Amino acid sequence: MVSSIESSVGTERKLVTAIPGPKSVAMHERRKKSVSAGLTQGFPVYIERAEGAILQDIDGNRILDLGSGIAVTTIGHAVPELVAAVSEQVADFTHTCFMVTPYESYIEVCEELSNITPGTHAKTSALFNSGAEAVENAVKIARLATGRQAVIVFDHAYHGRTNLTMALTAKNMPYKDRFGPFAGEVYRMPMSYPFQDGLSGQEAAARAIKMIETQVGAGNVAALLIEPIQGEGGFIVPAPGFLPALSEWTTKNGVVFIADEIQSGFGRTGEWFAVDHEGVVPDMITTAKGLAGGMPLSGVTGRAELMNAVHEGGLGGTYGGNPVTCVAALAVIRVMRERNLIARARELGDAITGALKVLQQDVAIIGEVRGKGAMIAMELVMPGTKEANAAAAKSIVSYCNSQGVIALACGTYGNVIRLLPPLTITNEQLADGLSVLATAVRAAG
């Protein structure tokens, strides 16, 4: 293992070979012989080290990261405080299983989650390994606490790849195709999608509520599960008033409001959580991704009376809340505070949105620029329409890849380009990435 000084990869994007380079090509041949073909690969290189917003591949190319490992490395790569915390913990002990012999860092993470999640009510948390596991446990808790079974989800939603979370997820390919049968008592409602439906938040909420009450019945609903800003579904930001109206309805009807903040949480949108933008206080909130800076940790935080309704032994998992992941999460939270990264997310969002809106004036394929904080996207359309233009998105991602810039596509129809830079990216790095992206968009449009 090399030190952080020895492993410095520089701060500028730099290509020394074509993408992919010869070593990555050879590595990919090895991969095909031993790794399941069911795993995709968005960027065709193999990484050996990373620092800040730069990844270095095995050919020596420096790649600019505008994806953060899908909103995970929010504080950047190889942050010294995180590296030190993890290294020290590994030297002490790596695992005991919290359910067998517990440790303080698990409790500290739960205390921090109580502090930073919305609301001043009493809360408790349980820690797990992945976002899907957190969502699955949130639903499990809601069903037990309410004595009801039905779960409301929304069009374009993504909640994971386990059997239950596949049922909760909207898009078939690649997430669900031929993996059924899926868990039952899941009911899908229309999402507020201002660019496509033109409805106000109140109108969109009334539409969804009417369908719930007519097709499911409020008294049968255990939980309403929603991403405050949808992630894989296309960075869809609901119209103002949509989330508050749903929250009000759930409170009135004894339904547990679960905010899936796995992609949108931990400062990504310019607040600790996306629901904070409209003052929504969920009954439960799921976290993962940015929570632990790349370590596999997730959490469910909720009203104490809900979380504590579960019988002893009803929650858990061998690795959930592993001590190494817990100290990583504590380091992430410290760095977020000390470097004022939530404010930085707002600055980045202003810069990205401004640049993309200028580009939109000249390029007809950009239907909408949307998002909050450093969670910004472009929806690409056929010129003069709102019809999805997935071919343009594919072309843009391919060009960015060839230039050593990671840009990710998403959306139910594959026509959205999303930007999720580390919050520690420099202004110069961001400008460089946006310049490459602009060239790609102009070529595609």
Feature roles, as predicted:
Residues 2-445:
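Conserved N-terminal phosphate-binding loop of PLP-dependent enzymes in the Aspartate aminotransferase
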